[in-house]
Amino acid sequence: MATANSIIVLDDDDEDEAAAQPGPSHPPPNPASPQAEAPGSSQPHGAGGSSSSGGKKCYKLENEKLFEEFLELCKMQTADHPEVVPFLYNRQQRAHSLFLASAEFCNILSRVLSRAQSRPAKLYVYINELCTVLKAHSAKKKLNLAPAATSSEPSGNNPPTDPSSDPTNAETTASEAPRTRGSRRQIQRLEQLLALYVAEIRRLQEKELDLSELDDPDSTYLQEARLKRKLIRLFGRLCELKDCSSLTGRVIEQRIPYRGTRYPEVNRRIERLINKPGPDTFPDYGDVLRAVEKAAARHSLGLPRQQLQLMAQDAFRDVGIRLQERRHLDLIYNFGCHLTDDYRPGIDPALSDPALARRLRENRSLAMSRLDEVISKYAMMQDKSEEGERQKRRARLPQATSSHSTDPLKASLDSGEGPSGMASQECPTTSKPETDDEEDEESEEEEEEEEEEEEEEATDSEEEEDLEQMQEGQGDDEEEEEEEEEAGQDGDKSPMSPPRISTEKNLEPSKGISRSMGEQQNKEFTVSPSSEEPLAPSSIDAESNGENLEELLLEEESPISQLFELEIEALPLDTTPSPEERDISSSRKQSEEPLTTVLENGAAMVTSTSFNGGVSPHTWGDSCPPCKKSRKEKETGAEPLGNSYVERQRSVHEKNGRKIPTLPSPPSPLTSMAPVADSSTRVDSPSHGLVTSSLCSASQARLSQTPHSQPSRPGTYKMSVATQCDPEEIIVLSDSD
C-alpha cells in the first residue's frame, strides 16, 4: 500500500515539475510510472491524463528515432548478412506497443546504440541483447496488457509507420484474448466431461453382467471399455491444454534398461526399440534382428551373420520376458475398480472355502490351456503365411540369374526369419526414418565410442610392444641355451663314436643285428616269472653289485617289466614315485640324444614320445631299454647326459662280448630347446625333458606267447605314451605286479 500511495503522490506532485526536466536523454530510475516523466513540451497541460498520453507519445517518437539509428548502424556493419535488419524490424513489430512507448525501451535503445557505436566489433552481441528484450515483451507473452494498450493508443498524430504496426498488434491481441478465454472454457468443459465419464464408468462397473449379454455388442463390459478409451483421449487432450505431462506413474510407462549383450551399441539400439514412444507394441524377432544388424553395420562391429542371429535370438527372449513381466505387473496394479479398493489379502474368501479355492485353481488351469491353444493356433497361421511369402519370393526370382541366386536366396531365408519370422527384407523402410533427437544421440554416442576406441588402441599397442620385447628376450635365452648344449655335446664326443649315417643306407647290417637280437630275446622269454620278481630289490643293492647288476638287468629284463617301467614313467605329475621308480625314470630321462637301432621284427626304428604325447624323431641305440643307474653314476653329473649314456651302453656291450654298431641320429629341435637339468632333479621337474617309450609293443605280447614263431614283416611301430598309459590301468598293473 505504501508503494501505491507513493506512486499516486508522485503523479500529483510532479505534474508542474515535468516541464523543468531536460528530456529523454536523462530518464528517471522508475520505469513503472513513465507517465510521471514527461519531457519538456511547449503545450500546456490541463490534466494528468493528457500529460501521461503526451509523455508516452513523445517516448514512442524518441524510441522510433533511436531504433532507426540502430538499424542504419546495423546496415553498415552487417553488409555480409542482410537478413539481420529485417529480423530486427520484425521483432520490433511483434513487440507490445506499450513497451515500445516506455522509458525502459528508450533506455535500452540508447545504451545499445552508444555501445555499438563505441565497440563495433561487438555489434552482434548488442543485437542479440535487443532481440532478447523484444522477444520477452512480445504481444503474445503479455496478453493481460492488451486492453490497456488499445485504450491508451491515440487515434491521431501518429507517424507513417503506426498504421502498419498498430492495427496488426490490435488484431493479434484481439485474437489471442479470445483464444485464452476459449482454452479456459475448453479446459473446464473437458474436466466436466471427464467427471461425467468417471461417474458413468463407476455405474457400469457396479452393474452385474449376465451370461446372455456376452454376445451382445452393446453389453455393459463393452460400453465400459469404450468409455475408458474416450477417457484416455480426453486426459491426453487436457494435458496438452494445461501444458503438463501425461505420465501417470504406471509400470507400463517405466523405461526398461537393456544390457543383455556385450556390445553397448547393440544394447542402446535394442533399448530404443523396446522403449519407443507410442502404443505398447511388442517387438517381433525380425524387429530385434534388424536393430542388431543396423547397430553392427553402423558401428562396423564385423560380426558374422550366425553370431548376429544368435545375439538377436537371445535378445528377443530376454526382451520378451521383461515386457511380459511389465505387462503382468501393470495388470495386477490396475486390475479391479472402486469396488475392490477395500480389498485386503487376508480377507480372501478362498482361504476359508476349500471348494471355492479348488474351483479357482481349475479355472486358472483351464484359462492357461486355452491361452496356449490360441497362441499356438495363430503362431501356426503366421508360419504358414510366412512360408507362402517365401515361396512367392522364390518364384519371382528370374531364371536367368539362377546361377547367381544362391547367395541372395540364402540371405532372404536367413534375414530375420526366426521364431516369429518377420523377414528383414519385407519392411526395410519401417525403421529407416529416425527422429532428430535419435540422430543427435547417435552422433554423441559415436563421438564417445571413437574416443574409447582410440584409448583402447593405445593400450593394445603398448601391450603388443611389451609382448614382443618379452618374446625377443625369451628367444635370445633359448638361442644361448642351444649354443651351450651344442658346444657341450661337441666337446664330449669320444673318438670311438662311429660316423653319422642314415638308417636307410644300413638296412643290410640291421638285418643281421635283428637276427642276433631275436636270439637274445628268445633267451629272455624263457626266463621264469620268479626271476622277474627280484627285479625291484636288485635296484636297492646297486651300490654293492656295481656293473654286474647292469649285466643281470640286461639279460633278465622281460617285455612285461619294460611295459611296467613305461607305465611308471607316464604317471601324472602329482604322484610321488618310489625310489625304484625314480631310478628307472631318471635313467631314462637322461637320454637327451638317444641312438637309433633296429627291432627284432625288422622295423627300421621305434620313435619316442614327448611329454604331451607327440612323437619325436629320437630312436634308441639298442633293442633293450636303458638300464638302471647306480647311485655313484647319479652323483657324478658333470658330463653331458647323452654321452654318458652312450659310453655306459658301450661298456655293457663290450663286457657281453658283442659289438653292435650304433647309428646316431641328428639332434632334435625339441631336445635342443629343452634345458639341461641334473639327474637328481629330473624326476622333480619332468616337464623339462622328454618321456621316452620302451621297445615293447603289441607284437611283443604275441612273441612272448609264441617265442619260436617267425618274425613278422618289417614295419614301424609308433606308440604314444599319452594314449596307452591310463592312470587306472597303472594302478591295476602295479597291484598285480
Swiss-Prot record:
Q: Which residues form a coiled coil?
A: 179-216, 432-474
One Gene Ontology biological process? negative regulation of gene expression
* Location of region: Interaction with SPOP: 624-737
Instruction: Please list the residue ranges that the record marks as compositionally biased, kind Low complexity.
Output: 33-45, 528-547
Query: Which parts of the sequence carry N6-acetyllysine?
Result: K511
Q: Name one GO molecular function term.
A: protein kinase binding
Output compositional bias ranges, type Polar residues.
Answer: 149-175, 422-432, 517-527, 678-713
Q: Where is this cross-link: Glycyl lysine isopeptide (Lys-Gly) (interchain with G-Cter in SUMO2)?
A: K142
Q: Where is this region: Necessary for interaction with USP7 and ATRX?
A: 1-159
Q: Which GO terms describe its cellular component?
A: chromosome, centromeric region; cytosol; nucleolus; nucleus; PML body
Q: Where is this motif: Nuclear localization signal?
A: 390-394, 626-632
- Covalent link location (Glycyl lysine isopeptide (Lys-Gly) (interchain with G-Cter in SUMO1)): K628, K629
Where is the stretch described as Sumo interaction motif (SIM)?
A: 730-737
Keyword Iron in annotation: no
UniProt modified residues of type Phosphoserine:
S25, S212, S412, S424, S494, S497, S558, S578, S665, S668, S685, S699, S734, S736
Signal peptide residue numbers: none
Record field: transmembrane = none
Alphabetized InterPro entries for the sequence: DAXX_histone-bd, DAXX_histone-bd_sf, Daxx_N, Daxx_N_sf
The record's region (Interaction with histone H3.3) falls at 182-417
Task: Locate the Phosphothreonine modifications and list their residues.
Answer: T459
Q: Where in the cell is it found?
A: Cytoplasm; Nucleus, Nucleoplasm; Nucleus, PML body; Nucleus, Nucleolus
Write out the ranges of the annotated region (Disordered).
1-55, 145-184, 382-556, 569-719
Cite the domain annotation text. The Sumo interaction motif mediates Sumo binding, and is required both for sumoylation and binding to sumoylated targets.
In the record, the note on similarity to other proteins reads: Belongs to the DAXX family.
Q: What does this protein do?
A: Transcription corepressor known to repress transcriptional potential of several sumoylated transcription factors. Down-regulates basal and activated transcription. Its transcription repressor activity is modulated by recruiting it to subnuclear compartments like the nucleolus or PML/POD/ND10 nuclear bodies through interactions with MCSR1 and PML, respectively. Seems to regulate transcription in PML/POD/ND10 nuclear bodies together with PML and may influence TNFRSF6-dependent apoptosis thereby. Inhibits transcriptional activation of PAX3 and ETS1 through direct protein-protein interactions.
The name this protein goes by in its record: Death domain-associated protein 6
Organism equals: Canis lupus familiaris
